C-alpha cells in the first residue's frame, strides 16, 4: 500500500514537472480572431483569461496558424460568433493543424459558436472533435438571456465554487442543442446540464434546450477539448469559468480565484429577453444618440438590470458624454458588469474628467474594475 502511494505521488510530481517545463512560467492561450468571431466575444474571452495569474493570452488569426503560431501556444479558444463562418475563415488545412495541436497534448475550448464548430453535425461545417452533434439547427435563433444550469458530479469537481448550488446562471445566446454523435465514436462527459427552456424567438419549439448538455468535455488524442454552449465570459461573476475550462484541457490543478472574481450570486434567476424586451433594447440605441441625460441614465439602468447583450457595444462612448451624470453612470455600468475590455477607456475617462465629484466617483468604479485582475 505504501509503495503504491509513493508511486502515485511520484507520478503526480512528474506530471506537474512536465507541465511546468512545457509552458515556462505562464500558460499560453490563443483566442482565434477571424471572420465569424464576434468582436465582443473575442474581447470578453481575452478578459476572462486575464483573470488567471498563471495564464497569458493573445489573439491569433488564420494566417498566424498557417505560419506556425500554434507551436507557441498551450491552448486555443474558438469564441462565440458564427461557427460555419469561422470554419470558412480557418480553412481545412488550418483545422487539421488545430486537430494535430490537440492530439499532441494541447487544449481547446469552444464557446457557443466554437462549441458548434467542434461538433459532428450533419449539414453543418464542423470539425468533429467533441463527440456531440447539434439538433434543431433550423431554430438556432431561439433567443438569449441569463439561463440556469446544474452541475453534474464531474462538473462539481471542476467548479467546486458552485458545487453546493442547485442552480447557477450564465448568459446563453442561441448556443447549440447537443446530443451524442451517432457517427463519431468520441465519448464526452457532461459537466453541466441546461435547466432553462429557451424558445423566445424564431418559432423555436418548447422543451428543446432544457435537460441538454451545457458543458461537455472529452479526450482527443493526448489532448483535451472543452465545449460550452453558453457564455460565462459574458457573465459578471462567472467569467472565471473560462480559464478553469482551459485548466481542465491542460490537466492543470484547480486554483481558487478571489471573491471579487467569483460571484455567482449576482444572478439568481433567469432573465430571458422577450420580443418586447428586444424592441425596447433597440430603442435605447437612439436614446444614447439623441436622448436627454435623464433618459440615458434610465436606459442604462434598464439595460444593466436585464443584462442586455447589445448595450456593451454602446456604453463605451458614454464615458465621454457631455453630462457628468451620464459619464458617472457609464463608468458604474462598466465596473458593475465587470467589463474589462473597457478598462483602458475608463482609465482615460478618469484622467480627463474635470468635474471633481464625478472624477472621484469614476475613480472608485475604476478601482472596482481593476480589482478583478490578479496582483502582479
Residue ranges: model-predicted function:
Residues 20-72:
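Aromatic-Pro/Gly-enriched surface loop or interdomain linker
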Residues 23-27, 99, 126, 212, ...:
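Extracellular ligand-binding/catalytic regions of CAZymes and related secreted enzymes
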Residues 291-292, 322-323, 354-355:
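Short inter-helical turns and helix N-cap capping residues of alpha-solenoid HEAT/ARM repeat scaffolds
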Residues 147-221, 229-236:
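Catalytic beta-strand/loop cores that center a nucleophilic Ser/Cys/Thr
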Residues 277-286, 308-320, 339-350, 373-376:
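Amphipathic alpha-helical scaffolding segments comprising HEAT/armadillo-like alpha-solenoid repeats
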Residues 84-163:
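A glycine-rich, often tryptophan-bearing local segment used as a flexible ligand/cofactor-contacting loop or short
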Amino acid at each position: 500500500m505504501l509503495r503504491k502511494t509513493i508511486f502515485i505521488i511520484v507520478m503526480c510530481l512528474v506530471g506537474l514537472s512536465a507541465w511546468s517545463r512545457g509552458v515556462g512560467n505562464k500558460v499560453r492561450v490563443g483566442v482565434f480572431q477571424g471572420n465569424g468571431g464576434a468582436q465582443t466575444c473575442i474581447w470578453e474571452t481575452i478578459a476572462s483569461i486575464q483573470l488567471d495569474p498563471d495564464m497569458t493570452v493573445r489573439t491569433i488569426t488564420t494566417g498566424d496558424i498557417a505560419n506556425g503560431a500554434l507551436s507557441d501556444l498551450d491552448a486555443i479558444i474558438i469564441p462565440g460568433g458564427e461557427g460555419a463562418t469561422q470554419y470558412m475563415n480557418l480553412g481545412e488545412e488550418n483545422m487539421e493543424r488545430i486537430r494535430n495541436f490537440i492530439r499532441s497534448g494541447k487544449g481547446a475550448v469552444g464557446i457557443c459558436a466554437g462549441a458548434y464548430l467542434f461538433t459532428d453535425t450533419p449539414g453543418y461545417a464542423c470539425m468533429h472533435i467533441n463527440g456531440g452533434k447539434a439538433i434543431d439547427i433550423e431554430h438556432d435563433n431561439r433567443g438569449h438571456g441569463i439561463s440556469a444550469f446544474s452541475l453534474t458530479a464531474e462538473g462539481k469537481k471542476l467548479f467546486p465554487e458552485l458545487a453546493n448550488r442547485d442552480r447557477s446562471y450564465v448568459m446563453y445566446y442561441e448556443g447549440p442543442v447537443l446530443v451524442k454523435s451517432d457517427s463519431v465514436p468520441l465519448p464526452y462527459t457532461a459537466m453541466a446540464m441546461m435547466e432553462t427552456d429557451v424558445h423566445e424567438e424564431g418559432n423555436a419549439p418548447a422543451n428543446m434546450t432544457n435537460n441538454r448538455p451545457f458543458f461537455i468535455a472529452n479526450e482527443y488524442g493526448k489532448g483535451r477539448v472543452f465545449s460550452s454552449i453558453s457564455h460565462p465570459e459574458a457573465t459578471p461573476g462567472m467569467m472565471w469559468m473560462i480559464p478553469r475550462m482551459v485548466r481542465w484541457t491542460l490537466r492543470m490543478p484547480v486554483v481558487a480565484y478571489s471573491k471579487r472574481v467569483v460571484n455567482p450570486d449576482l444572478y439568481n434567476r433567469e432573465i430571458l429577453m422577450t420580443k418586447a424586451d428586444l424592441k425596447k433594447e433597440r430603442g435605447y440605441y437612439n436614446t444614447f444618440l439623441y436622448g436627454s441625460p435623464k433618459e440615458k441614465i434610465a436606459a442604462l439602468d434598464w439595460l444593466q438590470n436585464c443584462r442586455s447583450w447589445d448595450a456593451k457595444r454602446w456604453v463605451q462612448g458614454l464615458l465621454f458624454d457631455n453630462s457628468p451624470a451620464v459619464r458617472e453612470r457609464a463608468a458604474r455600468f462598466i465596473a458593475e458588469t465587470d467589463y474589462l475590455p473597457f478598462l483602458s477607456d475608463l482609465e482615460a475617462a478618469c484622467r480627463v474628467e474635470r468635474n471633481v465629484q464625478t472624477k472621484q466617483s469614476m475613480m472608485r468604479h475604476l478601482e472596482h474594475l481593476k480589482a478583478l485582475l490578479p496582483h502582479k
